[in-house]
C-alpha cells in the first residue's frame, strides 16, 4: 500500500530547467514566472506559459524532479488546480504568484520526536537515507539539547545500528522499536507503523508520565472522560453496532498506551488509531482544525481567507460533517444502518467524535472512520480489472453527493474472495458542496462507466429520495444550508431521470463535471436557464419544478442523440 506526504524540493540551481518545454525562451510575451512553495523550503521559480495546461506543468515537475504527475496536487489561492486539461491562465495565475505543491511519495517516512518535557522535533526522511543522516538531522535541530553525534547510540532489537544502515532496511523488518541512548542518559523509543515512525525521547525521571503524541492524547485518569467519545446531537439517534465497536476498539488501543500515529497521506491531518494490541489500525481520525487551509493544518497549506475550503462550495471545518453524511446517506439495499447492514456503495462506518487532550484539558473534534485493510488504491493499478457493479456503486454515490474530490487514490481495492475485487470509497470531505463548480469524477474515464445500469442498481436509484435524505441529516444534527440542499435535490433528480432513460454513469456524470475551468458544466447551464425563467421571489419548490422540466428536455435530447450511435 502506498504512502504519501509533503515532499521537499531542493532550491533550483538553474531556473532554465523549469523554462517552458525545456527551452530558455525567457522573454516570451506569453510567459510568466511563478513560485513553487513547499514547507521548509524557499519558494522556487518556475517559468510557464499562460497557454500551458495544468497537465504540462505537472509533467515538467515530473521530468525535472521525478515526482510522478498522479502524485502531485497543485494549490493556488486556496483552490486546487484539479482539471489537468485547463490552462494555467484559467485559474488566474499571473506573474509572481505562489503555487503550493503537495507531492505524495511512496518512500517518504514522517518522523516525530518528542521529549518528556514537551519539546518536539519533526522530520520527513526518505527511506533511502541512513541512520547517520537521521542523527545529523536530530543534532542540527536540537543543538546542544541532545548532545553531539558521538554521544548518540541507536539500538534496534538488541543490536546497535551502524550509521550507514538505511532507513528502508530497518522498515522491512516490520514494526520496530529503536532506542537512542545519550550520555545524560536518555533514550528515544521509535515505533514503526505502516506509514509512520513515532520517536519518543525519554529521560529516566519523566518515564512514567510520558503519554503524549502528535494529538497530545493521553491515557485518562480514573474519573476522567473516555479518550474518544461520539458526538450525538439528537438523543434519538442510534449508532450502528459497527460504529460503536470501532469506538470501543479505538478507546482500548489508547488506554493500552497505543497512541494515534499521523499518516503522511492527504492534505490535512490524518491519524491512524491502533487496536488494543497495537499491531493493527482500527480507525482513521481527521480533526476539523487540521483540515486543508484550517488553522492547525500540518501540511503547510495557507489559511483560508474567506472560509471557503480547498474545493469551491465547501467550508473549512465542515469536512468531518461531510464524511459522516456520506456514511449516513449510503443507504443499504435492504434493512437499515442501525441494524449494521452495509450501505450500497460501501462507505466505511463513520462517526463524529471528540478526542481529548488529557494533558491540556481540551479536545479535538473530527471524523472517525473504520480502517479497511486493503491491497492499495485504484491509483496503484489499471481500472479494467474492476467489476462493473463495483465502479457503478461509487459512481452513484458521487453523482448523488456531487463529490468534488473523487480520484483513484481515494478508492481502496480489497480482495473479496479469490478472484473478486471490491472497491471501497473513502475521503468524502468535499461532497455535498453548495455548487457544482468543482465536481470531478476520475471513474468517468473508466470503461465500466459506459456500461448501462443493471436492474438491481436501477431499482436502488429509483428508491432514492433527496427530501428524506435532507430530513435524515437534520435528524442526525446537520441542517444542510439551502445551497447544499438544492445541490443534493438537483443531483439526485439528475441521477434518477438519467437512469430512467437508460443513460450510463458516464452520460450522467459528464453533465455534472466541467471540461475546463472556464466552461460551465451542463448542469450549471440548466440551473442558469431555470433562474432566467422564474420571477424574483419564486418558491424553491417552483424553482425545482422548472429545473425538472428543463432537465427533461436536455435528457430527452441526449437520449435521442445516443440512440443514433
From Swiss-Prot:
Region described as G-loop: spans on this chain: 263-269
Keywords, comma-separated and alphabetical: ATP-binding, Endoplasmic reticulum, Flowering, Kinase, Nucleotide-binding, Nucleus, Repeat, Transferase
GO terms assigned for molecular function: 1-phosphatidylinositol 4-kinase activity; ATP binding
Family matches, as PROSITE patterns: PI3_4_KINASE_3 (PS50290), UBIQUITIN_2 (PS50053)
EC id: 2.7.1.67
Phenotype on disruption: Early flowering phenotype under long day conditions.
GO-annotated biological processes: flower development; negative regulation of long-day photoperiodism, flowering
Positions with a binding annotation for ATP: 264-270, 286, 369-372, 427
GO cellular component assignments: endoplasmic reticulum; nucleus
All residue ranges annotated as the PI3K/PI4K catalytic domain in the record: 257-542
Segments of this protein annotated with the region Disordered: 291-311
Enzyme class: transferase
Substrates-to-products reaction catalysed: a 1,2-diacyl-sn-glycero-3-phospho-(1D-myo-inositol) + ATP = a 1,2-diacyl-sn-glycero-3-phospho-(1D-myo-inositol 4-phosphate) + ADP + H(+)
Positions of region (Catalytic loop): 402-410
Function: The phosphorylation of phosphatidylinositol (PI) to PI4P is the first committed step in the generation of phosphatidylinositol 4,5-bisphosphate (PIP2), a precursor of the second messenger inositol 1,4,5-trisphosphate (InsP3). Involved in the control of flowering under long day conditions by promoting degradation of FTIP1. Recruits FTIP1 for degradation by the 26S proteasome in leaves, which affects RFT1 transport to the shoot apical meristem (SAM).
Protein name: Phosphatidylinositol 4-kinase gamma 4
GN (gene name): PI4KG4
Amino acid at each position: 500500500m502506498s504512502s504519501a506526504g509533503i515532499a521537499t524540493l531542493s532550491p533550483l540551481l538553474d531556473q532554465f530547467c523549469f523554462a517552458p518545454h525545456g527551452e530558455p525562451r525567457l522573454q516570451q510575451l506569453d510567459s510568466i514566472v511563478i513560485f513553487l512553495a513547499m514547507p521548509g523550503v524557499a519558494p522556487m521559480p518556475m517559468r510557464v506559459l499562460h497557454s500551458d495546461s495544468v497537465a504540462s506543468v505537472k509533467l515538467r515537475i515530473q521530468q525535472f524532479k521525478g515526482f510522478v504527475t498522479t502524485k502531485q496536487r497543485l494549490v493556488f489561492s486556496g483552490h486546487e488546480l484539479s482539471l489537468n486539461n485547463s490552462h494555467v491562465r484559467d485559474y488566474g495565475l499571473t506573474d509572481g504568484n505562489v503555487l503550493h505543491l503537495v507531492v505524495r511519495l511512496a518512500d517518504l517516512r514522517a518522523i516525530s520526536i518528542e521529549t518528556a518535557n514537551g519539546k518536539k522535533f519533526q522530520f520527513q526522511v526518505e527511506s533511502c537515507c541512513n541512520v547517520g543522516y537521521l542523527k545529523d538531522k536530530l543534532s542540527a535541530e536540537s543543538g546542544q539539547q541532545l548532545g553531539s553525534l558521538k554521544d548518540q547510540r541507536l539500538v534496534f532489537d538488541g543490536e546497535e545500528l551502524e550509521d550507514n544502515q538505511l532507513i528502508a532496511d530497518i522498515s522491512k523488518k516490520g514494526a520496530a522499536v529503536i532506542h537512542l541512548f545519550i550520555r545524560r542518559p536518555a533514550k528515544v523509543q521509535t515505533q514503526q507503523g505502516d506509514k509512520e515512525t513515532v520517536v519518543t525521547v525519554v529521560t529516566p525521571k519523566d518515564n512514567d508520565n510520558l503519554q503524549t503524541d502528535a494529538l497530545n492524547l493521553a491515557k485518562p485518569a480514573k474519573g476522567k472522560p473516555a479518550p474518544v467519545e461520539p458526538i450525538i446531537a439528537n438523543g434519538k439517534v442510534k449508532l450502528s453496532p459497527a460504529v460503536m465497536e470501532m469506538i470501543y476498539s479505538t478507546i482500548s488501543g489508547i488506554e493500552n498506551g497505543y497512541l494515534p500515529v499521523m499518516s503522511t497521506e492527504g492534505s490535512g491531518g490524518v491519524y491512524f488509531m491502533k487496536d488494543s494490541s497495537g499491531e493493527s489500525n482500527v480507525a482513521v481520525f481527521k480533526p476539523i482544525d487540521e483540515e486543508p487551509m484550517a488553522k492547525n493544518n500540518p501540511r503547510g497549506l495557507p489559511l483560508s481567507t474567506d472560509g471557503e475550503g480547498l474545493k469551491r462550495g465547501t467550508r473549512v471545518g465542515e469536512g468531518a460533517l461531510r464524511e459522516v453524511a456520506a456514511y449516513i446517506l449510503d443507504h443499504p439495499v435492504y434493512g437499515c444502518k442501525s441494524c449494521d447492514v452495509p450501505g450500497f456503495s460501501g462507505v466505511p462506518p463513520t462517526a463524529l467524535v471528540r478526542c481529548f487532550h488529557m494533558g491540556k484539558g481540551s479536545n479535538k473534534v473530527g471524523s472517525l472512520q473504520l480502517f479497511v485493510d486493503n491491497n492499495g488504491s485504484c491509483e496503484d493499478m489499471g481500472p479494467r480489472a474492476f467489476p462493473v457493479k463495483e465502479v457503478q456503486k461509487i459512481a452513484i454515490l458521487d453523482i448523488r453527493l456531487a463529490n468534488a474530490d473523487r480520484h483513484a487514490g481515494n478508492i481502496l481495492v480489497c480482495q473479496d474472495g479469490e478472484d473478486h475485487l471490491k472497491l471501497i470509497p473513502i475521503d468524502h470531505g468535499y461532497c455535498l458542496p453548495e455548487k457544482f463548480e468543482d465536481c470531478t469524477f476520475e471513474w468517468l474515464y473508466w470503461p465500466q462507466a459506459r456500461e448501462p445500469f443493471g436492474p438491481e442498481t436501477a431499482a436502488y436509484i429509483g428508491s432514492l429520495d433527496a427530501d428524506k435524505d435532507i430530513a435524515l441529516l437534520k435528524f442526525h444534527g446537520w441542517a444542510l444550508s439551502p445551497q447544499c440542499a438544492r445541490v443534493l435535490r438537483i443531483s439526485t433528480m439528475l441521477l434518477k431521470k438519467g437512469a430512467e432513460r437508460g443513460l450510463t454513469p458516464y452520460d450522467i456524470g459528464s453533465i455534472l463535471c466541467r471540461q475546463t475551468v472556464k466552461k460551465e458544466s451542463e448542469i450549471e447551464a440548466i440551473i442558469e436557464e431555470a433562474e432566467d425563467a422564474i420571477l424574483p421571489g419564486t418558491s424553491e419548490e417552483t424553482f425545482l419544478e422548472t429545473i425538472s422540466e428543463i432537465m427533461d428536455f436536455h435528457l430527452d435530447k441526449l437520449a435521442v442523440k445516443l440512440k443514433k450511435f
